[in-house]
Amino acid sequence: MVNMANTVKVAAVQMAMHCNVEDNIFTAENFVRQAAAKGAKVILLPELFETKYFCQERNYGYYKIASTAEENKAVRRFSQVAKSLGVVIPVSFFEREKNNTYNSVAMIDADGSILGVYRKTHIPDDQFYQEKFYFTPGNTGFKVWKTAYGNIGVGICWDQWFPETARCMALMGADMLLYPTAIGSEPILDVDSMPHWRRCMQGHAACNIIPVIAANRVGTEDVIPCEENANQRSSLTFYGSSFITDACGELIAEADRSSEGVITAELDLSAAYDLRMSWGLFRDRRPEQYAMLTK
């Protein structure tokens, strides 16, 4: 079912992260309040915004910051903020459950309740994004939550590169697809991946006729060699460029590569639903022909 309010204003927060968790939560809250003041009802924060992107290095000390959703400082704070402002806030956090840790999102509804947790399905692993060292591949399956402002699906960063993520959430009835992100320049490659990154998600919007919201961080984050990280050195410049598309994949709001701030856009969910139905993309699917996708 679509949101019977027909239209909803959404926002993406773009921010730089620092060493202190409380400072990052404070900054994120200020941006959330700015977005709400502009009328936004669904507000997306970047991936793992409580900390710098620690996955640039392998350091066992970072396991200490993992927590359950109930214990997590950001989840607890934004549950209060969401209730106070009457907004929906997906919160990305480093989750601990028993002997496993996950890269997760807690979906907080406009009444402050936690509707559930999604755990990142696709976990990258290379010199600059060493996430397999920290995160177990998610076991929740893809999630779409019925919120006060529509049915919302969330994929986390690397999930956004896989069309299966978007299509599964579309089949589950998502009105919008949200992607909290931490991505930047790759020093070992003489390329700029930002346009490719954007086009990938614009394609998901167009192929499913569902709006997409992506929130990225900005700033350069350096890893200093030390005994705890086995003398690893790394540096990433996160290229921001957060954006919002309409249901056909057109950019309707975008941030630059380096500035902190909030972008907003009005989404007509009812019109998107009507357009989605008129195209027949889901009517004409042939799942019995897609067995290769499971191999």
Q: What function would you assign to each model-found segment?
A:
Residues 10, 24, 32-61, 82, ...:
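Active-site beta-strand/loop signature of hydrolases that rely on acidic residues for catalysis
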Residues 270-295:
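A conserved C-terminal secondary-structure "cap"
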Residues 10, 107-115, 245-252:
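Short, glycine-anchored, charge-dense loop/turn motifs used at functional sites
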Residues 3-16:
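Short beta-strand segments enriched in small/hydrophobic residues
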Residues 67-70, 80, 96-203, 278-279:
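Active-site catalytic loop in hydrolytic enzyme cores
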Residues 91-93, 104-107, 143, 242-244, ...:
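Short beta-strand scaffold segments in enzyme catalytic cores
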Residues 70-90, 157-261:
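CN hydrolase (nitrilase-like) catalytic-core segments centered on the catalytic cysteine
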Residues 58-71:
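A charged helix-plus-loop insertion that forms the helical arch/lid used to bind
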